[in-house]
């Protein structure tokens, strides 16, 4: 009688389930959709601040991409007119630097703030859903596994939400910078990016290796968390049966399996990341060699050569970030599937 009364009171006190309820901030209920599309309702709830964030990032990118062109013009004017004409460009470059700093600071601040807020929304969503699941769910799923999904898995998604847009903006800068390079000198621009298709091939191979290892690593992190949580919760039982040595052995085996998968993941990154980051830097050697020869021959000016050097540094940024973002994408994909396994459980308390 008392237990039934408490159950009725508990159900009455709980708010309606927000996970799949229409109009609520939750995940998409269609399990056949791509994992990113299932998270769209959470992203849509922050669409205003996200739009402001991307607007600041794009405007700051336009300013940044325009700097080498202004610098090119300033150097050419200074070489043609040594007596003057340079001070105006100095003030323009100073103003562009201040504007780029302010816009990029605002963009990064708002982006990370939005990512953390979405992480908070997802944590709250999982917490409210866990309070509505039947006891049979906790009989099937270990407590350490639940803790891992509610912490490290959500953290993986938050990191992708923070660094994914950063990489997208860097990729946009590559497109814009390459377009400006083509407008200056087509053969030199094509020679500079000749090695980029190889970077794409390496990135695809890295993705194929990283995803299964990320999935296994996340699961084994949950296994270690489960062993630790069970021993903390059942300390008295372990001591009563003098099972300390047995539990230490269980933890050692779980940690060994985690070490193997984590080491394999690092090894996969180490085989591909150096090449992915180094190949774009060969473009600088092409600019110095081929571009220097063109400058000596009088086909391009010194300002053009400096602008190309600046653009080469700019277009190498997305490739330096590519390995990290690919790893975070694979980890977030694996983590989202583990989180959806909880959120897709039918609650008994409505």
Model feature map: region roles:
Residues 1-32:
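Membrane-proximal cytosolic tails and large cytosolic loops of membrane proteins
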Residues 45, 49-62, 166-217, 289-300:
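Transmembrane helices of ABC transporter permease
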Residues 3-6, 10, 50-103, 182-187, ...:
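Transmembrane helix-loop-helix hairpins at lipid-water interfaces of multipass membrane proteins
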Residues 37-40, 48-69, 73, 89, ...:
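Alpha-helical segments in transporter systems
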